[in-house]
Amino acid sequence: MIQNQKIIDTQRVINYINSFLDNVRVEDIIQNSGADKLRVYPALFELEQSGFLEVVEREELGAPLIVMKRKNG
């Protein structure tokens, strides 16, 4: 069940990011995507590692503040 919820929340994050053409604030993803707020940062990390998105701006300690879908060259 936990694995299924992780997949569902990751898909919610993907769907939310896909609804924008440009940058997306992580705070907006947390508030509006429907994903559990505790799963958003791990999902963003996995999506960055997979090449789906890029982090445009980070906090001082490295947490993403603004992300965008990676444009395929």
Language model regions located:
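Long, compositionally biased intrinsically disordered regions
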Residues: M1, N32-S33, F52
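Short, cationic-aromatic polyanion-contact patches
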Residues: I2-T10, N23-R25, E57-G73
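Short acidic, hydrophobic short linear motifs in intrinsically disordered regions
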Residues: F20-S33
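Proline- and acidic/polar-enriched loop/turn elements at helix boundaries
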Residues: I29, P42, E59-E60
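Short amphipathic alpha-helical interaction segments
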Residues: A35-E46
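A short, conserved structural fragment
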Residues: E48-R58
